């Protein structure tokens, strides 16, 4: 007898989801704290902080947590930590390029944890610059679809704010801009009564590697292992995984 009741399985799954949610909250709060430390605690004069707060709120991070992070970052509250931003590069299975963005208070720990996760999951650490040239740093705003909303409507609303292109990505429209124009594009979209689902600085691949189910499974396992690390904020990779392949991998 396995001793694994349906309730035990459900409870385990809930524990995993709760743990991941807790990690996500911690990462978002860390971003808010760093933004406040870098540019001050007033979101009106600190676009990076305004975007970090908006993202945290979109993921239901409690307001108290956000406020405390702002106060720690701006020095109003004791207990602030000095975080360092560092990016690691790697090749994953099938030569997929991987960028790992970290915010850490211990660079040696972050480097060690990232290296272990990469090598244990079929990847190879790469020298600085050997992978990043395959990506462009951009601002990406996702806008919820409505029955009547078109790409032209969105472009008209956000073009003057610095939008470069609008793409239909299935359940949303994606607005791409220079990273420095992200906040202006998000504000322009909101002022045009468009529903902003997210606004992030992203590393978009200039070249993609199409993957079948088995290599896709391996790459996603690597990405999941990296995202599970406390110091890791974002993982970017240039695998092109179609909806059909993703369905196979998820089943």
Curated annotation (Swiss-Prot):
PANTHER family: TRANSCRIPTIONAL REGULATORY PROTEIN YEBC-RELATED (PTHR12532:SF6), TRANSLATIONAL ACTIVATOR OF CYTOCHROME C OXIDASE 1 (PTHR12532). Belongs to the TACO1 family. The lineage of its organism: Bacteria, Bacillati, Actinomycetota, Actinomycetes, Frankiales. One of its GO terms (molecular function) is DNA binding. Keywords: Cytoplasm, DNA-binding, Transcription, Transcription regulation. GO terms for cellular component: cytosol. It comes from the Bacteria. It is found in: Cytoplasm. HAMAP family: Transcrip_reg_TACO1. Its main location: cytoplasm. The keyword Cytoplasm applies. It holds the Pfam family TACO1_YebC_N. The keyword GTP-binding does not apply. NCBIfam families: PRK00110.1, PRK12378.1, YebC/PmpR family DNA-binding transcriptional regulator. GO terms for biological process: regulation of DNA-templated transcription. This is Probable transcriptional regulatory protein Franean1_5147.
């Amino acid at each position: 007898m396995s001793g694994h009741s349906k309730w035990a399985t459900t409870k385990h799954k809930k524990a995993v989801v709760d743990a991941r949610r807790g990690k996500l909250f911690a990462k978002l709060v860390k971003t808010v704290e760093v933004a406040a430390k870098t540019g001050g605690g007033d979101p009106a004069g600190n676009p990076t902080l305004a975007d970090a707060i908006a993202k945290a709120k979109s993921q239901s991070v409690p307001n108290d947590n956000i406020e405390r992070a702002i106060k720690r970052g701006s020095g109003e509250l004791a207990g602030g930590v000095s975080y360092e931003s560092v990016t690691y590069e790697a090749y994953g299975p099938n030569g997929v390029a991987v960028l790992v963005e970290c915010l850490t208070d211990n660079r040696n720990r972050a480097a060690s944890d990232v290296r272990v996760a990469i090598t244990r999951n079929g990847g190879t650490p790469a020298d600085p610059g050997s992978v990043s040239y395959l990506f462009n740093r951009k601002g990406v705003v996702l806008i919820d679809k409505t029955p009547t909303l078109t790409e032209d409507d969105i472009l008209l609303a956000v073009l003057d704010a610095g939008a470069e292109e609008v793409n239909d990505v299935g359940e949303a429209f994606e607005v791409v801009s220079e990273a420095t124009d992200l906040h202006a594009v998000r504000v322009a979209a909101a002022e045009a009564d468009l529903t902003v689902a997210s606004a992030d600085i992203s590393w978009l691949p200039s070249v993609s590697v199409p993957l079948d189910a088995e290599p896709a499974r391996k790459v996603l396992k690597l990405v999941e292992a990296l995202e599970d690390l406390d110091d890791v904020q974002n993982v970017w990779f240039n695998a092109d995984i179609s909806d059909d392949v993703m369905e196979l991998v998820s089943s």
